[in-house]
């Protein structure tokens, strides 16, 4: 897959997909109740739109209904799925699962994948330790496993950093505050925990602290205090895909559904 950016998608065999679904059915209810409320990726009743609306709700709270400046720290993890440390993930799972048969299966599933990251993309600390890395993007179990992995960070954020306004969707997460210095103080702790506990690194080009009024790019939309607009790159991709499609095609309808969640009246007219 190369749209919107190159990604390695690994499609399991039919037999393996059945196994992944069976494992997910057993593990999801157990782990989902351990996740924080504001983790929104690949969870029942969550999703991108719920994450965006929670972001808006927190923005209103931290700005006292938009009467004060709202600052946002936006972070993105570099090469997320390919950088998951398999040893650390298995240690987390072993702390929470007592069934040895399930653990054996998880060892087999996780250990069967090897990341195709080039040496320059692997963080220095991971190269030094020669850690087995990566989860296959495309497997149902991978979506759950990365949530289990990042739950370590979520719990740290809520219980150690005491962050009040925090939203995460997969490898994208934001912190909100009326005090810019508060976010600046949080930032080094975020870097250190991700590096030392999870062996993950932030993407240097996708981290910023800015005001909500200046526009915050999060989950494909640029958010402002009273509205959101579609990100330019997302807009171009949408037009490229729909230019030769009928208005009632499934792809066009899915985009129209997405556009309902922002200020997109003119865009909708162009799609139909």
What are these regions (language model features)?
Residues 21, 126-132, 181-185, 202-272:
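Right-hand nucleic-acid polymerase module
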Residues 29-38:
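Charged boundary/loop elements
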Residues 8-13:
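Conserved phosphate-binding loops in nucleotide/dinucleotide-binding enzymes
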Residues 38, 58-170, 174-190, 201, ...:
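Conserved polymerase palm-domain catalytic core
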Residues 14-18:
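Acidic, glycine-rich two-metal-ion catalytic cores of nucleic acid-processing enzymes
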